[in-house]
Regions:
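Ser/Thr-rich, Pro/Gly/Ala-heavy low-complexity intrinsically disordered linkers and tails
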Residues: 1-38, 286-287
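Short loop/turn segments that connect beta-strands within beta-propeller blades
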Residues: 59-62, 101-105, 161-166, 205-209, ...
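Blade-level signature of beta-propeller repeat domains, shared across WD40, Kelch, NHL, RCC1
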Residues: 247-287
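Repeated scaffold domains used in trafficking and secretory/extracellular systems
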Residues: 35-37, 74-85, 116-130, 173-186, ...
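Conserved beta-propeller blade signature
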Residues: 44-48, 86-91, 133-141, 188-192, ...
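Structural motif
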Residues: 51-56, 95-101, 146-160, 197-203, ...
């Protein structure tokens, strides 16, 4: 995410000229890729920088591995999610959504189109598990910029990104300003919210978009970009260091503890604007 209302509008985005809709949930990485349904590479956190560099981050050892530079989109990444097949979905600042093989960095642009100024041109995004086995849904939460109407009680709309029709179906609004999203293998959806100089982690209702809970994050100051993911039963927050825009701070939060977020890496050697983790990621730290 970069620091850069509810209504009865219909689905947003469509299949554009020059491309036909396929079952997006079945888009597979290319032959020779090590990605695949819940393969080993889907068990990490993936990061994308403002300069389109793709990385894998291994929380157990605090290791960062560069995969390569992406060649999709022309406005720079805005947010990212990763599915169970090892495909990253990245929304661009200019609105397009691309799919990326997380093992190789190969990418292609989807037909998703939204006009400038329309809802869901930019959004936080994440997959969360469904009730059925091996099923998941891509959730997106609208991001609003240069909006003087937020006041003291901002709200944003949650939607579902349909990977067959390349359209967003709005669900409803929840309290809180712009947020990056992360989902869990047990079906919950959370947001890392920046609001009025403070930061929060919130849980959202996947049916209505309502904010179910909110927890302040003392000591976590969001600058020009931020992202987060869940791994090993904890939340991992990535916040760009504004005094050095080429690096980030990494915080870890145990949701079952009342302790504040722990700064685990003062300097991660990349700025981070998007983070994604699949619903295959471990819910406990592997031994």
């Amino acid at each position: 995410m970069d620091a850069g209302g509810a209504g009865p509008f219909g689905a947003i985005g469509h299949v554009g000229d020059g491309g036909s809709a396929r079952d997006g949930s079945g888009w597979d990485p290319p032959p020779g890729s090590s990605a695949g349904p819940c393969s080993d590479v889907t068990h990490h956190i993936y990061l994308v920088s403002p300069s389109q560099e793709l990385f894998s981050f291994h929380p157990a050892g605090l290791e960062l591995h560069r995969i390569g530079r992406l060649r999709c989109g022309d406005g720079g990444p805005f947010s990212m999610a990763v599915d169970r097949n090892g495909v990253a979905w990245i929304v661009d600042w200019n609105g397009p959504v691309s799919r990326v093989d997380i093992a190789t960095g190969r990418c292609e642009t989807t037909p998703y189109k939204v006009e400038d100024g329309a809802p869901f041109r930019n959004f936080g995004m994440a997959f969360a598990a469904d009730d059925g086995p091996d099923q998941e849904t891509l959730y997106v939460r609208d991001a609003v910029f240069f909006n003087d109407t937020d006041g003291a009680n901002p709200a944003r709309t949650l939607g579902v990104f349909d990977r067959r029709s390349y359209a967003v179906r709005p669900l409803g609004q929840g309290a809180g300003a712009n947020a990056d999203l992360t989902g869990t293998g047990d079906g919950r959806l959370f947001g890392f919210v920046k609001q009025s100089g403070a930061s929060f982690v919130s849980e959202f209702d996947k049916l209505t978009g309502a904010t179910l809970s909110e927890r302040a994050l003392p000591g976590v100051t969001i600058g020009s970009s931020w992202a987060f993911a869940t791994w090993g039963g904890a939340f991992w927050f990535f916040v760009t260091n504004d005094e050095d825009a080429l690096s980030s701070r990494v915080y870890r939060l145990d949701p079952d503890s009342q302790a504040p977020p722990e700064l685990v890496m003062p300097v991660l050697l990349t700025a981070v604007i998007g983070a994604g983790v699949s619903t295959c990621a471990p819910t406990e730290v592997p031994h």
